Swiss-Prot record:
The gene is slc25a40. Keywords: Membrane, Mitochondrion, Mitochondrion inner membrane, Repeat, Transmembrane, Transmembrane helix, Transport. This is Mitochondrial glutathione transporter SLC25A40. The lineage of its organism: Eukaryota, Metazoa, Chordata, Craniata, Vertebrata. It comes from the Eukaryota. Probable mitochondrial transporter required for glutathione import into mitochondria. Glutathione, which plays key roles in oxidative metabolism, is produced exclusively in the cytosol and is imported in many organelles. Mitochondrial glutathione is required for the activity and stability of proteins containing iron-sulfur clusters. Solcar repeats lie at residues 14-132, 140-224, 234-328. Pfam families: Mito_carr. The keyword Mitochondrion applies. Its main location: mitochondrion. Belongs to the mitochondrial carrier (TC 2.A.29) family. GO terms for biological process: import into the mitochondrion. Gene3D superfamilies: Mitochondrial carrier domain. It comes from Danio rerio (Zebrafish). GO terms for cellular component: mitochondrial inner membrane; mitochondrion. It catalyses: glutathione(in) = glutathione(out).
Length: 353
């Protein structure tokens, strides 16, 4: 088996359920390793510019970005905990010493409710589509990762988008599940099903190009590294390196879409909190024009290094743990098949005698 073909594996080599288990494990490990970096970043931001009530900020668990709405000053929330930090390392050490190591994962559990299922759907769909497209595309099979990545991202975003909308609305308006269901029914009655996918378009503008480029570069990079180091199967180091490089390239190219989407999400969340019309900033195009007018074209590339530092390790950890999980299940299946074959030989030999 060539290294480039090793990601999806041949039919029957690894089951979709095992792919789901591998991606679920990868998602949890990624969030546990990446979240502390974002928690420290948010604590440093809150120290420099305290978050007022209704202010929104972006929380990243390494899998998805989540818009969080600040609660009032009387509530003891993790991002308003007292502390004076001189830098990132100092913040890490003081948070662990003063608040306990668990504080580095503050706010993580609620975000995993959507992030883990979205990741499982995304990675499993990609592998299934990649295997199918490689067979169907023939001489153009090199482009299979491009199309498989784009389609898989559309699918996962479509499934998760209504849940993200509901989560943000519940947090910003402090509604119960019963009140929320009434709001949803009213929205469906007045605006139709489209109301549940508000913000879906801007999400796809960033995530679909990112996904297509990421998988295309990842498969190419993995194949090249395997060839370079004469590996028949990709090692953890190879998948980690290919994931980091492909994630970096995709994040740089799609940065303007990320800037626009994040600004739009934050503005929409704050307008919802203040009970103002969300139509003020509903257009992606208008947000982009406003950014250029206020900060020039360079404004669309704001946060270049923070995004790179966030995306590269997250992509590397996720893909390497996912590939490791698939390799584990592949080996398990082969051993099981070998044992079954050996048992059949023993039985047939016994019957002959």
């Amino acid at each position: 088996m060539s290294c480039q073909e090793s990601s999806p594996g041949p039919p029957g080599d690894i089951t979709p359920f095992q792919q789901m288990m591998a991606s679920c494990s990868g998602a949890i490990i990624t969030s546990l390793l990446v979240t502390p970096l974002d928690v420290v970043k948010i604590r440093l931001q809150a120290q420099k510019n305290p978050f007022p009530k209704g202010k929104c900020f972006v929380y990243c668990n390494g899998l998805m970005d989540h818009i969080c709405v600040c609660e009032n000053g009387n509530t003891k929330v993790w991002y308003k905990a007292p502390g004076h930090f001189s830098g990132t390392l100092d913040a890490f050490l003081k948070i662990i010493r003063m608040e306990g190591i668990r504080s580095l994962w503050s706010g993580l559990p609620p975000t995993l409710i959507m992030a883990v299922p979205a990741t499982v759907i995304y990675f499993t769909c990609y592998d299934q589509l990649f295997a199918l497209l490689k067979l169907k595309m023939g001489d153009r099979s090199d482009l299979a990762p491009l199309f498989a990545g784009a389609i898989a991202r559309v699918g996962s975003a479509t499934v998760i988008s209504p849940l993200e909308l509901i989560r943000t609305k519940m947090q910003s308006e402090k509604q119960s599940y019963r009140e929320m269901s009434a709001v949803i029914r009213s929205a469906l009655k007045n605006e139709g099903l489209r109301s549940l996918w508000r913000g879906w378009g801007p999400t796809l503008l960033r995530d679909v190009p990112f996904s297509a480029m990421y998988w295309f570069n990842y498969e190419k990079g993995k194949w090249w590294l395997c060839k370079r180091y004469s590996c028949s199967e990709p090692t953890v180091a190879i998948t980690f390196t290919a994931g980091a490089l492909s994630g970096s390239i995709a994040s740089i190219i799609t940065l303007p879409f990320d800037v626009v989407k994040t600004k739009r999400q934050v503005e929409m969340g704050e307008l919802q909190t203040m009970k103002l019309s969300t139509q003020v900033s509903s257009s992606t195009c208008s947000v982009m024009k406003r950014i250029v007018a206020e900060n020039g074209v360079s404004g669309l590339f704001a946060g270049f290094m923070p995004r790179l530092i966030k995306v590269a390790p997250a992509c590397a950890i996720m893909i390497s743990t996912y590939e490791f999980g698939k390799a584990f299940f592949r080996k398990y299946n082969h051993q099981k098949e070998g044992q079954a074959t050996a048992s059949q030989h023993i039985i047939s030999h016994t019957e002959k005698h």
